[in-house]
A protein has these predicted regions:
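A glycine-rich (often HGG/GG-containing) alpha/beta subdomain
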Residues: 1-146
Length: 148
């Protein structure tokens, strides 16, 4: 199971940050980071649920945020996937990433790994994956249009 910050954050942070998790242990990760209190998440796929995020080792509150659950195969990667929408301060982001990295069988994704998993699971074809890369890297209006 992998995780990564999906939001491009400036050094000063932002209002909101999104962290994605994908893989077989995604529900375990949700349970750990919410201390088993992600009420209704399984019954409400693709709907935002407000949750407290805690460090499972200390029970310390990290943040309050929205959790979205996308069960396989109807997710970007074709795997179980969730998004944690948190406040975008660097302190909150760094704590969440640190805690996720300490959960068993959960590791930081390599660059492009979410898209590679989508490609391998038949959710995208190669041209679409290249288009996503080009769109992410687009700096001009012309580059944005070509990527789409």
């Amino acid at each position: 199971t992998i995780f990564a910050l999906s939001t491009n954050i400036k050094s000063s942070g932002s209002a909101i940050a999104v962290i994605r998790v994908s893989g077989d242990k995604t529900l375990n990760v949700i349970d750990e980071i919410t201390n088993g209190k992600a009420d209704g998440i399984r019954e409400k796929p693709r709907q935002a649920c407000l949750n407290d995020y805690v460090d499972p080792k200390t029970n310390e509150l990290i943040d309050k945020g929205m959790t979205l659950w996308f069960p396989r195969p109807k997710s970007y990667t074709g795997e179980d996937l969730c998004e944690f929408h948190i406040h975008g301060s660097m302190a909150v982001i760094n704590k969440m990433l640190s805690v996720l990295g300490n959960i068993n069988d959960c590791r930081l994704a390599r660059e492009g790994e979410f898209t590679r998993r989508a490609l391998m699971n038949g959710k995208l074809h190669l041209i679409q994956a290249e288009g996503i890369r080009d769109l992410i890297n687009a700096r001009t209006e012309n580059q944005r249009r070509r990527a789409l």
